[in-house]
Amino acid sequence: MFVSGKSVLFAGTLSLLIAVAARAQLPQAPPPPTPGLAPAPVPPPPVRTRYFTSLTNIEVEKYLQYNDLIFIPIGNVQAYGVLPVDCEYVAAEAMALKMAEETDGLVFPYLQFTYPGDGIIGRGTVHVSPAAGIAYLKPIARSLLRQGFKRQIYITVGNNAAPETVSPLVLEFFYETKTPALYIEGDVLLRKVNADFTKVMFGAYSVLNRLDDIPLNFTPTVAKHDIDQGLATLRMINSSGGARDGIVGFVMFEDDAGAPVKAVTAEQRAAWAKEGADMIEAAVKQADMKKVVQSLLDHQRFTREYLIPKFDSLPR
């Protein structure tokens, strides 16, 4: 049977058109990404609360899939004039909360019974030695590390003796785990913004929605007492930083320790609370906490990938 060339050409063209039409109906693959551009990062899911202890285990597990950051406020309980005895812990917790909000971290609360340092004359003071505090805190730090919180940042505010507990804690934790933790003295950050520490205490209660815990129109009874002239002289000649540096042991009365001992009105409490909260916020902003937590991550990576393999004789 003779088939002309035109018929063959027509049939071939028709088959090609049918194939093209059929292919057009198939699902199409997405276009390839532009060379050199990474896919847009998926934002981490928001946490319901910043407080570790208020999350469910499911929420903690989910958080640890994309982050490993936890802020740990450390405080004490001691007599402090018109303020509740936990005020220095509250100040540390408020600052830790603000830092966590800045960096998508969590807060590990309730660690408020450590060495109070000065001002321990008073039955409202719970005395815990630095050694006892470290012995309590270190297992918690190690547990948090095992759980996945590799970046631990410890915060104190208001207690000059806090380094007696927290500095040895972070050092011993590093020697034992080879994981650097960070200790931030909130007082240093607050001084950089010229904060008034009494107002900071009021602001901290406001940040934590506990302002009503500060009593109104209340004047504490401070026993009349002599001045420790020897300690006063040592301080003036800068030969001793007191309990902070472990150079000389001492105790103080509330008024000597700088605690507010005059009655506070409702208007004054509200005004100081707002000013103090603003000071805490300013101190955290000035510190650039996102840079701090990234730097801690970089330091940990350098330690793990360079220092430890190269210098196996690091303290154990």
Segments and roles (model prediction):
Residues 1-5:
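N-terminal secretory signal peptides that target proteins for export/translocation
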Residues 10-19:
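Bacterial N-terminal signal peptides
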Residues 21-23:
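Juxtamembrane cytosolic interface motif at the C-terminal end of transmembrane helices
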Residues 25-117, 122-127, 138-150, 157-316:
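Extended, histidine- and acidic-residue-enriched regions that form the cofactor-binding/catalytic faces
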Residues 133:
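Helix-loop module immediately N-terminal to the HCX5R catalytic loop
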